[in-house]
Amino acid sequence: MNRISSLALCLSLLWLGGCGTLPGTQSRSGIPARGEPFMRTSPAEVAASPTLRRLANEAALLQPLTQSDLTRRFLDATSSLPRIAPRTAYVYEMTREYYSPAARNALPEPRRSQLTETQLDEFRYYFTKYGSPLAYIRALEFASDQNFRDVAGKRILDFGYGSIGHLRLLASLGAQVTGVDPDSYLAALYTDSADTGTVPPAAGASRRSRGSITLVQGHWPKDTKVIEQVGRGYDLILSKNTLKRGYVKPERKVEDKRQLIDLRVSDQVFLTTIYNTLAPGGKLVIYNLHPRAATARERYKPMADGRSPFSREQFEKAGLQVVAFDAEDHAAVRKMGRLLKWDQNEKGETIDDLDNNLFALVTVVVRPAR
């Protein structure tokens, strides 16, 4: 969702790179034209792309942290990510609302003239505003612990997906993946027909099930149309840095409402929808990273309260079995953060103490098989 980036900004976990078209990407061979299906990337193309090269390096660094075949295959699949040509989008600076070229052209002329054109390059395609898609390995480890070891043929929903990178990795392993998010930035970025639909299998992946990506913009589960587009029968629902108590139920007054997330439905309706959206035996994994909480004298930071916004009793009342509730994953996420250099700036200088300013809490619930 569009408030997820606050965590990265607060922690100063700034990823390298930035906006702007990669030199030569407009005409470089190997990058498909708009609407053409993505093909498997060659080693030479990976070497030519700073973004894909970075992801490959991150995957190699993170491999020693993996504890399951699922996360190992997830990281291995980075070698099959396609090159991406820059995309044009338009932004209304007053509200930070983004528009695709088609959406911009549909606006009346007075509004069109108020928009600023911007180029979203390959780095933004995979990292968007929220950092490395490979940071999903910790959430996937907890899913694997619940006998979710092979995604081929499985249906996965990401609530507040924030980036297509991890969705494409899962789809390349054979999963039918749906991402739902109201953020206009994502809707303006992922407009090519090749961004969704069937995804070619990653090198070494099973070919018995072809994966796919579906992207849905809107407020789930408030909007009826969005509920219909998302559908039911999911084997896994992921929520990373979205369903935080600080975002959904802040303990102090927050003046800037953009820091919060309004689910637009009651807790009961939301959890009942989770139950109905999961297949029997399906899992929900809520994985939240957060910085140190503010003291009583400091300004309240909604992103720093990473607890589940729902109680154990609420989950159980909705018919869901609680496997883990606000379980700590601090040590593992700090190891990951150091490998991804979340504690360093672009010059390699240490700017944050992850031992005292990076934490992770995870909640896992299951819809009973019967």
Please place each PLM-identified region on the residue numbering.
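A short acidic, Gly/Pro-enriched loop at the edge of an enzyme's catalytic core
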Residues: K225-L236
